[in-house]
Amino acid sequence: MIDHIDNYNTIISTEALDTLTAERESHLQPLVFVEPDRYAAYTGMRSLVIVGDSGSGKTALRLALTRQVAPENTPPTYLVVNWQPEPFEDVHGSPAVRVFVRQALHACATTLLTILVKHPDLFRRAPPTVQMTFHWFIQAHISADRQHLWASMAEQAVNDEGKALGQHLIFEPATAILYPDTTEQRIIAHLTATLQRIGIRGVWITIDGFDPWLRGSTALVSEQMIAILSTLELLDLNGFAIKMFAPRALESDITRSWGIVKGRIELDTLTWTPEQLTTITERHIAAKIGKPSLHLSDLCVADRDIRDWLQRYGGSTPRGWLRLIRPLVDAFAAAGASHPLPHSVWNSLKRTHPPRLSIDLKADRVFIGEAEIVGLQPRSYRLLRYLYE
């Protein structure tokens, strides 16, 4: 049984379950993350696309991979750059890929600068040719607003040496290393080879955050992602990998990309077992009430019924389970969070918070609670949709 918690932690437990998005709870992720079954396969230099429903933990997985290979306070194993999808109007095919690569190079330059400012020893101990290449690459690809960039870098420098290095790399003229008309692929190849000379094995471009672009038509974002994932010149570069975390709505289009067809990119689906979902749920609740650990039996004596309820109506995503259990957590916190709630409270919560019917009209998917109902006959679906609308 868990001990009584103070009012501050009670407030955390009742409010923190509102967001249920990893990017807004990054401080909790090291405490609550559970490795999916194929986690180890995601950590190398192979390009991959991981597909999952909204709330399945794609961003949490991306953040965990980043923490592993690019921890906050030590030099990284890989240069990890997160690129946010932003469909380019009236730009298609190869031109869209070039826009993506230019943006990725800009992000690489900013990330590399941040690493060197935080870890100036990496630069100071590097051979002169490596120092010259980094200086040139950063100058060639950072934003034009260098004063603003410098202000940001100065905040991240851990000592005066880092600040001085940041000023040098941003403002001091750099010697050109490659010709101005050098292809982006050649620039990336030169960058990765240089990074490897200081112990950074390569570059990961992580792509996440599709949801805002899927509220309307998915055609434009699908077309541009297919173009990027079909550019074999990028996918064949040594020390360069794309790791995309994509919603299920894009899966059928992405599978047509040349990179997947030719086996340059691995396609995987993010799934969880009921046991993993239980652990994720328990860890979230424990973190949010300030406890090192917690089990469903600590919330309520009806823990077996609660687990069955979650498996039946919580669906297959962590967000689904956390949404479903939110009323129980609220009741637990309101009661003082010192003793498991009785059966009567759980039975009352089931009556007052029944799982509701919802239909994704765009995707023709039917849900009760957070669980999808599969195998509906067309006639039954049309009737449900008519009543729902």
Walk through the language-model features, giving the residues of each.
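Amphipathic alpha-helical "lid/sensor" segments that cap RecA-like P-loop NTPase cores
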Residues: 289-293, 298-351
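A short, basic N-terminal segment
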Residues: 1-48, 53, 68-74
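The catalytic "switch" region of P-loop NTPases
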Residues: 184-312
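Trafficking entry modules
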Residues: 350-361, 375-378
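P-loop NTPase nucleotide-binding core
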Residues: 46-47, 53-203, 216
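Short amphipathic alpha-helical recognition elements used for nucleic-acid or partner binding
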Residues: 373-389
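Short, amphipathic alpha-helical segments that act as regulatory/interfacial helices
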Residues: 66, 105, 109-113, 311, ...
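Short, Lys/Arg-enriched N-terminal segment that forms or immediately precedes the first helix
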Residues: 361-373
